[in-house]
Amino acid sequence: MYFDIKAFLDAQTQELTQRNPAVEKRVELRGGQIETTRVPEVDWSKELQIFYQADINKPALRGAYAVDSVAKGDTLRRTYSRKTGIDNAVERITVLSVVATPAVAQEITATLTQDNPLFFSQKRVMMHTTDGRLSDYQVKGVQKLVLFDTLRYSAAGRVLN
C-alpha cells in the first residue's frame, strides 16, 4: 500500500473548510509578472483538486511503483517512482514525514507527466504542512501542444491564519 494521498487531502479539505482561512495566491504565466491576490473565502475541495491527481493508491497500480525510504533522525523520506513500462501520469511522489504515532506528512511533492505525439504536459505539485495543517502549496507546469508555443506556469497559495 502506498501513501494514501486521498485520505490525507480529504482530512485537509475538511479541516480547512471548518477553519475557513484566507489564502494569499501568486500566479505567474509565461515567465511574466507575478500577480498576487488575497482570497478571503476558498472552496477547498476545488482548490486542492489537482493534488488528487497524484493518487497512486489504487488496486490497478499495486506493484507499479518502486518505493525508496530514507530515515534521518525523526524524519522519513519515502519516494514512490513509477516503474518502467507502467502507463500512469504520476511519475514520482515524495512524502517527507515526521516519525510519530501517527506519522505526520510535512511535505508532499509529485511529478505528473502526460506525453503523446500531439501533447506534452508536466506538472510538479508540492504542499507543506505545519503541525499537520496545510500551510502552503504550489503547482509548476509546462504544456506543449504540437504547432503551438510552450506554456510555462506556476501558481502558489499560502494559507493565512
Predicted regions and their residues:
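Gly/Pro-enriched, hydrophobic low-complexity segments
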Residues: 77-161
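Surface-exposed acidic loop/strand-edge motifs in secreted or periplasmic proteins
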Residues: 16-99
